[in-house]
């Protein structure tokens, strides 16, 4: 940077000069002062026009009349006015005569004192006045002074002493490379601002010696600087009186004038007021200097009059006339910074790089400010010379910045710095849960930014994403995003470099040097969207912002024909995009590598992947800079931290990034710390590793490096004082990251983090979570490194570093424009202009209307966006590209909102406003009041780039029962609509997504709040997003491909650990929730793999407490605390497997959707008393997992819940997790939560399931009586139940059925109770769900909901299928778990797993229990309830079947669900109605049974029912089978001999091993001690989808057959649904069936359960089912039961054999499972779609396709076997031939021997 510092030869002269005015007041003129001459000439005689009554329009004097009367340009103004010095100015100043010099000096003096000085010690005589006037007239038209000067330096009070001394002082202070200590005290006193007290010790001890010049105070934006230019007219014609006022206020002691600011007659306050009044006008003039005319011309042109006119015009304009430049709408921007490009700003700021003041920046600003006691009493001791301290003051006021008042034990609040101590988060203007007050902003922001795949606002750069990259970006799902990086800088390298293009350089009179790159391309994607040609353009000016983007050829008006090989004239293209550019100045650049390389260097100037970071060591009790620098060596805590942070490297010979360290002679130390993160190299300047100088307190060798680092880490030991930047003196250190260690050098070591940054450094991520300490781990290291990298990137956006970069950029452009161009203009067609003279000028063709809407880049509109956080409107630029929607605030020039176009689900538009809904219903509102057509354009653009649609507003009416007639799940998706009800008539359809209810955004509501609003609002007005054509709900990409990090009840206090990976020591707490909004207990979050492993642990053991904790506890829908609902002392013993987590809980809960308490500890059995309402909620007891396992092992009595049941739950969870697979652990955790919640919350379950429910939800919903399913046998009126369920909209009463009776008989197993409770506890989301909570709805709902919920699956559709599969998976998982847990329970429960028969019974019967009234619909409802119960665990298979047939099918995947359902139905024989889990599975899959019920085939269910039998056999299966038998008679025709037989089989299944094969069945059966009805549900689980399909070839074959059977029956719907889910869960289910199968393990581990589960299943061999056991004579045999049992047994054997096969072929099985998993995923989308709609042909086709795939796999195996057999046959044939030959040979030999014998005998 060129220095204004005087040369050494001139300095003595200046120093020796006396002041212009002596002490006596007489002027003393020195004519040999070159600088004085120069400044006078520039200023036109320092006060020439002071006395003029009316100044000339733009004369020198008039410029200074009021703001700086008679005062010479001084200080930075004098230095910057024309910087660098221009030759013309120098010459002119040289030519000025001594007389002019003298007179100007006198003029200056007289102007200060000429008015009758009131209080001044000197007055001018008439001669002096005449001289002043003469000088004014003489120099009136001289070169005008630079108008871009700070008023502070033109005010008399700014110069208490001689102007000459002040000028000399200014000259000394160039780039700040001269230290203050070089000045004598007098000089400083003279030049120091009047607002500061002078001090004797002016010097700078610390800090960088190169503070950067800059315009305006730190942190000011350009438009802020313009605000002072408004009132220029008022300052145009000052009178002598006014001037005298100014002179009086500013007397200077040091000179001969009595104008001392402090001691003058006018108070300091008045001085301050006057000072403020003068600052703004001057700044306005400075702006006018950079008007429309070229600055180069202004500086070099002698035509002052012409310049004066242009300046006058600009001065007369108001600030409002200067508006940001708007790019033509046809231009599609490539990145965010291109949208921010402002041509008007470039014009006005073009020369700001030259007119910069030195400022005190970084930590030095705080250091100086800390020494100031008040705005008028700054101490000069530590201030920078001439203006640095002034710059610290805000523009409009001298008041000092006070900081942000944020402090903690790590950092103190400090002036000019902003602190981040945790919880700040990212600014959000959209309406979402995170900013709706549901939970603290810090937590939401923290987990959003750290764990979600959302790109932070500061991380958005490139907006145009190529089609091939439209897949989910890996970078977006990384934990920490690098921010503030101009990735668009690669635009030239990517699209121009080494491709055919044109470069044009030139010097525009307004813009200065410019460089333009243009390329015409024909991208393939353009062929589909209209214009085949596209122009890519880069327009560069001296400003850092660059215009990058493209424009379609069809959008450009041109005289040439479009879409030709020749293309359009480039001149017309540029004139259309940048009309302000004078294209005639452009010349074609050389086509050489040097030019292209320099262009790339210019564009990528701001990209730096090598960073240096300082590390300061602060011991206990220390806080100052000297103390930290003087720590000679590092302590153990510091060493431990350094070891975590990076690698200790030897500097000598180090070849990587060295960060100015000496790698040859060790002068900067022998070692340093180096590391890499992502693409960045980081070299740390560690204070203790840099050389230590014992005799130097300042440790300059250390400060030399660390003091010049932009980012510094301050490591604090315990006991260190809070850090404050005011203790540091450096102009470069802008950001400090404070890290404090806790429990150093121990296993529990952890770190706290805080950040303090200079106020003009924008905020940066990742955000610091509030109150969180980071354990020592790679996660913390990544967090810290990302924070440091982002800090430096953000600091480069501060004024100081932008000024440096702008200067560099300008030099690059100058070099290109002057040295690398040809003489070829951009339009070289004018060789013979006379030819075209006679012809008429060609008219330009009109552009194709709306052509730009198909552009790939971002189309921009100026809008007003609503900030929901601050309840205000913002002037923003809305940019919509093919991948992003961004809102950029114009004032701060920062992105305030961004989302992916693939996340947009819909919008609501009016003539002047637009509300865009994205992701889960969050919304952002924009409006346009200028052009109503803009809203239409934005809507068209949204239609082009997104899959959303226009929303629909409707008013819903209630029926006679006050019901709205539809069910809505927790996501706001309509799960079921009552056919031909009011809602249906209004146009509401299944799959519709509610985004607003009564003007309240659904995204801000919890599910309970949503339901409450629907139930209580008098007039229900909703805004919905219509579903897709196939009735699937519109889902965002985020929902589809990544699971939400939180449960659906986000407003319930989920522990931060769940959302943040650093703290994992907190366990879930059981909190009684007093209402629907009661917080769920958060669970500790484990890594996804850990969670899966835990979940999958076999041996019936519950997962570790951490995993259990992961599942939050929900509160009952009726708002009662879960604890009250489930008391450990209840009569019913409930053993919950860790896997079951929430499922078992849900089962026990009667009407509360979220009745189960958090499953934090899955271990332990509870003895629960039936609630008066007749339902007990089984909760996970705090008991240890081991305990639970043991209890389940007991299994002898119905009381103990078989381990299989627990396994089932956990397996389902695991399966869901495994399906998520690639999704991040957050998703995984989320899914767990969902499972749990649904479990606890039947409504939640139904919430999840309804979306996926395929069965006629309307019917199921209507079946309020079905809801009665409540375990209470007593039939309570639907209304009664509805009263309990707050979530039911369709039928509120159906949601919860209460009975005064006990749910279970004493002999009923816990599992039974649980399943039944589950049914009871189910509550519909909006009422319909409640009804569906009945067997069919609940189970289906839970699974379906899970599927529909974003958490349920990686993709929207996939998610839904995932849940389906999860139901299947659950069944499988349950089985697997069962197998694992079976270790103990399996033996007893294996028979239970055969509850298929009972399942069929329950299904067949309307499932009317003795005391409860159930219709088939009820049964369906009951099943749904069960499933709802299940839904708590994502895999709820219970569902109600309308027809007994459905229930009969044992193969249905809902068998797992049946385990639950069976438990409920088996609780009492008379209570024949139990929700069918099979039905649930169906619903999960998305199939709905016309009957409204779901097939449930669960051997386990049947067994469980049998267990409730009076004959409780030691084995649970026996008991279950008995129960089933008893129930079967009661059940409707559905309960048939088949079911009874199945029950018997289950009861008598020979060994626990055989049970293993039916593990999933067993799981369900133990739960249901009730009769056959629950069994039916289980049977559903057991259906083909569960066992057969997943078992080996035969098993698959059987399964498929079973599935077909189920489909044929009313249950087939269930089965179908199960089957669809099957594809996802298939691998899982197969493992469950073949717990012992290795292949099963592979599949199961992949999707269903954790690796441990798989291992467990492998360990446990699949026992041969053996002969079909005969029923006990005392077991009320029934032929139908026998038939059912026989069928079930057949399937069981098939499964067993299949499992055996798979055991022999573990690899192939595993691969098969993977294939199945893939298949499931592939089918997920279609399934989910079908879920939301009634069963359709498409959904069945999908199901059949899945079956076909499995059959193909079986066929493949059969072919392999056939080939093997053929080979064997060939061997046999060969052996046969060989044997024949041998036989022939033997015969021949024998013949010969015989002949020989006979011959011998004859001879003898």
UniProtKB/Swiss-Prot annotation:
Annotated region described as Disordered, given as residue ranges: 1-157, 277-297, 380-401, 1067-1128, 1144-1207, 1268-1306, 1327-1366, 1379-1475, 1505-1536
Location of Phosphothreonine modifications: 1330, 1551
GO BP term (any one): regulation of dendritic spine morphogenesis
Annotated PROSITE patterns: PDZ, RAPGAP
InterPro entries linked: PDZ, PDZ_sf, Rap/Ran-GAP_sf, Rap/Ran_GAP_dom, Rap1_Ran_GAP, SIPA1L_C
Comp. bias intervals (Basic and acidic residues): 27-36, 84-94, 1379-1389, 1507-1527
Ranges of Low complexity composition bias in the record: 95-129, 1144-1160, 1282-1297, 1336-1349, 1450-1472
One Pfam family in the UniProt entry: Rap_GAP
GO cellular component, as recorded: actin cytoskeleton; cytoplasm; dendritic spine; plasma membrane; postsynaptic density
Main localization (coarse): cytoplasm
Localization per record: Cytoplasm, Cytoskeleton; Postsynaptic density; Synapse, Synaptosome
Subunit structure: Interacts with DLG4, PDLIM5, PDLIM7 and LZTS3. Interacts with the actin cytoskeleton. Interacts (via PDZ domain) with EPHA4 (via PDZ motif); controls neuronal morphology through regulation of the RAP1 (RAP1A or RAP1B) and RAP2 (RAP2A, RAP2B or RAP2C) GTPases. Interacts with HPV E6.
PANTHER family: RAP GTPASE-ACTIVATING PROTEIN, SIGNAL-INDUCED PROLIFERATION-ASSOCIATED 1-LIKE PROTEIN 1
Name of the protein described by the UniProt record: Signal-induced proliferation-associated 1-like protein 1
Taxonomic source organism: Homo sapiens
């Amino acid at each position: 940077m060129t220095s204004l510092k005087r040369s050494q030869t001139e300095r003595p002269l200046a120093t020796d000069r006396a002041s212009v005015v002596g002490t006596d007041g007489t002027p003393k003129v020195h004519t040999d002062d070159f600088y004085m001459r120069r400044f006078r000439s520039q200023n036109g005689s320092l006060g020439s026009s002071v006395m003029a009554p009316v100044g000339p329009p733009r004369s020198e004097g008039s410029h200074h009349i009021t703001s700086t009367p008679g005062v010479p340009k001084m200080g930075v103004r004098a230095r910057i006015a024309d910087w660098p010095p221009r030759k013309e100015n120098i010459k002119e100043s040289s030519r000025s005569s001594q007389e002019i010099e003298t007179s100007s000096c006198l003029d200056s003096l007289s102007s200060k004192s000429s008015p009758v000085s009131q209080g001044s010690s000197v007055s001018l005589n008439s001669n002096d006045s005449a001289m002043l006037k003469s000088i004014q007239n003489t120099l009136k038209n001289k070169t005008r002074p630079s108008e871009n000067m700070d008023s502070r330096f033109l005010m008399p009070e700014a110069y208490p002493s001689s102007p000459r001394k002040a000028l000399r002082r200014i000259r000394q202070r160039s780039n700040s490379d001269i230290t203050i200590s070089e000045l004598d005290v007098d000089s400083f006193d003279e030049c120091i601002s009047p607002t500061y007290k002078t001090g004797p010790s002016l010097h700078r001890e610390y800090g960088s010696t190169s503070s950067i010049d800059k315009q305006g105070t730190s942190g000011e934006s350009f438009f802020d600087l313009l605000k002072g230019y408004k009132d220029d007219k008022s300052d145009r014609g000052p009178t002598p009186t006014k001037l005298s006022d100014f002179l009086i206020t500013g007397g200077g002691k040091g000179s001969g004038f009595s104008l001392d600011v402090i001691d003058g007659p006018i108070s300091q306050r008045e001085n301050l007021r006057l000072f403020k009044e003068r600052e703004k006008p001057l700044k306005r003039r400075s702006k006018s200097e950079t008007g429309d005319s070229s600055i180069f011309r202004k500086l070099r042109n002698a035509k002052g009059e012409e310049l004066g006119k242009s300046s006058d015009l600009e001065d007369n304009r108001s600030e409002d006339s200067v508006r940001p430049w708007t790019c033509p709408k046809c231009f599609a921007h490539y990145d965010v910074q291109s949208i921010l490009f402002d041509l008007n700003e470039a014009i006005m700021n073009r020369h700001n790089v030259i007119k910069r003041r030195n400022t005190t920046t970084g930590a030095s600003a705080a250091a100086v400010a800390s020494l100031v006691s008040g705005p008028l009493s700054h101490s000069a001791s530590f201030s920078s010379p001439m203006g640095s301290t002034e710059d610290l003051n805000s523009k409009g006021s001298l008041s000092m910045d006070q900081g942000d008042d944020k402090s903690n034990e790590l950092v103190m609040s400090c002036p000019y710095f902003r602190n981040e101590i945790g919880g700040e988060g990212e600014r959000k203007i959209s309406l979402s849960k995170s900013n709706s007050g549901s939970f603290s902003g810090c937590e939401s922001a923290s987990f959003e930014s750290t764990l979600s795949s959302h790109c932070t606002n500061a991380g958005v750069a490139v907006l145009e994403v190529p089609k091939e990259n439209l897949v989910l970006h890996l970078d977006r799902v990384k934990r920490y995003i690098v921010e503030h990086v101009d990735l668009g800088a690669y635009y030239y390298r990517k699209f121009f470099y080494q491709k055919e293009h044109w470069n044009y350089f030139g010097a525009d009179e307004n813009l200065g040097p410019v460089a333009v790159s243009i390329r015409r391309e024909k991208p393939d994607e353009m062929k589909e969207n209209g214009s085949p040609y596209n122009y890519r353009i880069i327009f560069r000016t001296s400003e850092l912002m660059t215009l990058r983007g493209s424009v379609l050829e069809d959008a450009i008006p041109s005289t040439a024909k479009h879409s030709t090989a020749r293309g359009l004239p480039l001149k017309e293209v540029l004139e259309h995009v940048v009309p302000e550019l004078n294209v005639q100045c452009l010349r074609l650049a050389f086509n050489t590598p040097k030019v292209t390389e320099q262009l790339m260097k210019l564009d990528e100037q701001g990209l730096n992947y090598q960073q240096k970071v300082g590390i300061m060591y602060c011991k206990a009790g220390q806080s100052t800079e000297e103390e930290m620098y003087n720590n000679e060596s590092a302590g153990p805590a510091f060493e431990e931290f350094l070891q975590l942070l990076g690698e200790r490297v030897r500097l000598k010979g180090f070849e990587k990034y060295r960060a100015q360290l000496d790698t040859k002679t060790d002068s900067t130390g022998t070692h340093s710390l180096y590391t890499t993160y992502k693409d960045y190299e980081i070299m740390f300047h560690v204070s203790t590793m840099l050389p230590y100088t014992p005799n130097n307190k300042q440790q300059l060798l250390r400060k030399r490096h660390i003091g010049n680092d932009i980012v510094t880490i301050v490591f604090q030991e315990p006991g260190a004082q809070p850090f404050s930047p005011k203790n540091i003196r450096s102009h470069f250190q802008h950001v400090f990251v404070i890290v404090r260690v806790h429990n150093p050098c121990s296993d529990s070591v952890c770190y706290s983090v805080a950040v303090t940054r200079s106020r003009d450094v924008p905020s940066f991520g990742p955000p610091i979570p509030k109150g969180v300490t980071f354990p020592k781990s790679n996660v913390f290291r990544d967090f810290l490194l990302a924070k440091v990298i982002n800090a430096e990137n953000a600091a480069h956006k501060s004024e100081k570093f932008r000024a440096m970069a702008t200067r560099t950029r300008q030099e690059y452009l100058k070099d290109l424009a002057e040295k690398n161009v040809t003489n070829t203009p951009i339009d070289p067609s004018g060789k013979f202009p006379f030819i075209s003279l006679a012809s008429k000028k060609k008219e330009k063709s009109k552009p194709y209307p709306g052509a730009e809407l198909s552009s790939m880049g971002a189309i921009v509109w100026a809008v007003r966006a609503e900030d929901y956080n601050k309840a205000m409107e913002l002037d923003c630029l809305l940019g919509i590209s093919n991948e992003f929607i961004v809102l950029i605030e114009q004032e701060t020039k920062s992105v305030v909102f961004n989302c992916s176009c693939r996340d947009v689900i819909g919008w609501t538009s009016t003539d002047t406003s637009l509300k865009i809904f994205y992701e889960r219903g969050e919304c952002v509102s924009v409006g346009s009041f200028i052009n109503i057509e803009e809203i239409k354009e934005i809507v068209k653009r949204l239609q082009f780039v997104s899959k959303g649609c226009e929303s629909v507003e409707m008013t819903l009416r209630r029926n006679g029962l006050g019901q709205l007639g539809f069910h809505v799940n927790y996501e706001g998706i309509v799960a079921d609509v009552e056919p031909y009800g009011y809602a249906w008539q209004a146009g509401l359809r299944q799959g519709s997504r509610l985004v607003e209810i009564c003007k309240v955004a659904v995204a801000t509501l919890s599910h309970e709040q949503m339901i409450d609003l629907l139930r209580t609002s008098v007039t229900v007005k909703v805004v919905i997003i219509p579903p897709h054509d196939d009735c699937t709900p519109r889902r965002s990409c985020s929902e589809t491909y990544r699971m939400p990090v939180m449960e659906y009840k986000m407003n319930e206090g989920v522990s931060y650990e769940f959302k943040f990976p650093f703290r994992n020591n907190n366990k879930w707490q059981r909190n009684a929730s007093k209402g629907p909004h009661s917080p769920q207990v958060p669970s500790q979050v484990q890594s996804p793999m850990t969670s899966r492993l835990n979940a999958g642990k076999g041996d019936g053991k519950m997962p570790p407490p951490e995993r259990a904790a992961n599942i939050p506890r929900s509160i009952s829908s009726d708002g009662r605390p879960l604890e009250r609902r489930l008391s450990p002392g209840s009569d019913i013993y409930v053993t919950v497997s860790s896997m079951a987590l929430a499922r078992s809980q849900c089962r026990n809960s009667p009407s509360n959707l979220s009745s189960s308490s958090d499953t934090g500890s899955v271990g332990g059995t509870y003895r629960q008393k039936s609630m008066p309402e007749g339902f007990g909620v089984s909760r996970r007891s705090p008991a240890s997992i081991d305990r639970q396992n043991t209890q389940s092992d007991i299994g002898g009595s119905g009381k103990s819940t078989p381990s299989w049941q627990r396994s089932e739950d956990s397996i389902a969870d695991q399966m869901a997790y495994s399906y998520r697979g690639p999704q991040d652990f957050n998703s995984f955790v989320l899914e767990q939560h969902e499972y749990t919640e649904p479990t606890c919350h039947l409504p939640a379950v139904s919430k999840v399931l309804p979306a996926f429910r395929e069965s006629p939800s309307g019917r199921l919903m209507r079946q309020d009586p079905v809801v009665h399913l409540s375990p209470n046998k007593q039939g309570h009126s639907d209304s009664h139940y509805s009263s309990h369920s707050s979530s039911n909209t369709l039928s509120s009463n159906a949601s919860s059925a209460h009975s005064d009776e006990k749910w279970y008989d004493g002999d009923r197993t816990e599992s039974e109770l649980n399943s039944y409770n589950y049914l009871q506890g189910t509550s519909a989301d909006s009422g319909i769900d409640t009804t569906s909570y009945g067997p069919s709805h609940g189970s289906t709902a839970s699974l379906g909901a899970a599927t529909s919920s974003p958490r349920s699956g990686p993709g929207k559709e996939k998610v839904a299928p995932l849940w389906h599969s999860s139901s299947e998976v659950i069944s499988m998982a349950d089985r697997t778990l069962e197998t694992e847990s079976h270790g103990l329970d399996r033996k007893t429960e294996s028979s239970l797993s055969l509850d298929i028969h009972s399942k069929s019974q329950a299904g067949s019967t309307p499932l009317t229990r003795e005391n409860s009234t159930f219709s088939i619909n009820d049964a369906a409802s009951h099943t749904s309830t069960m499933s709802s119960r299940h839904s708590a665990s994502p895999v709820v298979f219970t569902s109600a079947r309308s027809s007994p047939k459905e229930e009969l099918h044992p193969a249905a995947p809902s068998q797992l669900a049946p385990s639950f359902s069976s438990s409920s139905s088996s609780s009492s024989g008379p209570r024949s109605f139990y929700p069918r889990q099979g039905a649930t599975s169906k619903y999960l899959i998305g199939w709905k049974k016309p009957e409204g019920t779901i097939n449930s085939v669960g051997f386990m269910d049947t067994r469980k029912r049998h267990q409730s039998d009076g004959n409780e056999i030691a084995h649970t299966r026996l008991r279950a089978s008995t129960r089933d038998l008893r129930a079967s008679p009661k059940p409707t025709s559905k309960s048939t001999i088949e079911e009874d037989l199945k029950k018997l089989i289950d009861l008598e299944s020979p060994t626990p091993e055989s049970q293993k094969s039916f593990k999933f069945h067993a799981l369900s059966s133990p739960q249901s001690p009730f009769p056959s009805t629950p069994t039916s549900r289980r049977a559903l689980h057991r259906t083909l989808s569960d066992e057969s399909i997943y078992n080996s070839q035969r098993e698959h074959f059987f399964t498929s057959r079973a599935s077909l059977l189920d489909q044929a029956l009313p249950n087939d719907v269930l089965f179908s649904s199960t089957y669809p889910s099957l594809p996802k869960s298939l691998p899982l289910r197969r493992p469950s069936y073949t717990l012992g199968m290795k292949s099963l393990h592979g599949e199961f581990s992949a999707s269903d359960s954790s690796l441990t589960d798989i291992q467990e299943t492998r360990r446990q061999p699949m026992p041969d089912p053996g002969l079909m056991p005969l029923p006990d004579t005392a077991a009320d045999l029934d032929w139908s039961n026998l038939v059912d049992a026989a069928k079930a047994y057949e399937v069981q054997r098939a499964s067993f054999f299949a499992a055996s096969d798979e055991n022999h072929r573990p690899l192939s099985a595993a691969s098969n499972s993977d294939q199945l998993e893939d298949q499931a995923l592939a089918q997920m989308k279609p399934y989910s779609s079908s879920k939301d709609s009634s069963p359709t042909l498409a959904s069945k086709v999908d199901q059949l396709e899945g079956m076909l795939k499995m059959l193909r796999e079986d066929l493949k195996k059969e072919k392999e076997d056939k080939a093997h057999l053929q080979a064997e046959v060939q061997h046999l044939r060969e052996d046969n031939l060989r044997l024949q030959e041998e036989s022939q040979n033997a015969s021949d030999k024998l013949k010969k021997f015989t002949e020989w014998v006979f011959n011998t005998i004859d001879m003898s």
